Amino acid sequence: GLGDVYKRQLGSIAIAANSFAVTAEGLCYMPGYGIGSAATTLVGRSYGAGNYKLAKRYGNICIAMGAVLMAITGGLMMIFCPFVFSILTPDPQVRSFAAEVLRIELLAEPFFGASIVAAGALRGTGDTFVPSLLNLGSIWVIRLGLAVLLITPLGLRGMWIAMAIELCIRGLLLLYRQHTSKYYKLPAA
């Protein structure tokens, strides 16, 4: 099946490294989801009260906070990921490869943070459909498409490069949506 093709293409060290890198990455983006929830609440309350300027301001402040905080957590993980992986596995090859691929993606953390929080801010205005399409489309078209192109020449590194590129593009798309959203100009329903 497809799992066997994946295993043959990448090998057991790459599969283990991928698993550990995904686990460690989760530590970096948790703060972004927290700030995204706060953005939904702050923007939603302001928007519901008819204060659209304040709603947009809260959205922008939260997005900046999310991007900065995730840049910081990404930077810390970039430094400390060898230690994190030493806790997760005794295998030096897996630790080294996990750190290598995770560091590729960590460069995109500020954009990932911006996308998470922008989606939350837009959700607070009731703008859910377009951000959902942007998320879905970027993952299924950009990330998957690039991964298919890059996996053969670059293996697991190619998959993580594809993810980093997609996260940057998604971040830019959602920042653009936040900047141009008509919802900040419309009265609450």
PLM regions: where:
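Short, small-residue-biased leader/transition segments that mark boundaries at the very start
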Residues: 1-6
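Interfacial/gating helices of multi-pass transporter permease domains
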Residues: 7-26, 92-100, 127, 161
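Alpha-helical structural context
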Residues: 9-10, 87, 125, 153
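Small-residue-rich hydrophobic transmembrane alpha-helices
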Residues: 17-81, 112-135
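Short runs within selected transmembrane alpha-helices of multi-pass transporters and secretion channels
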Residues: 33-36, 105-124, 130-140, 146, ...
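Short alpha-helical transmembrane segments in multi-pass integral membrane proteins
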Residues: 43-108, 150-189
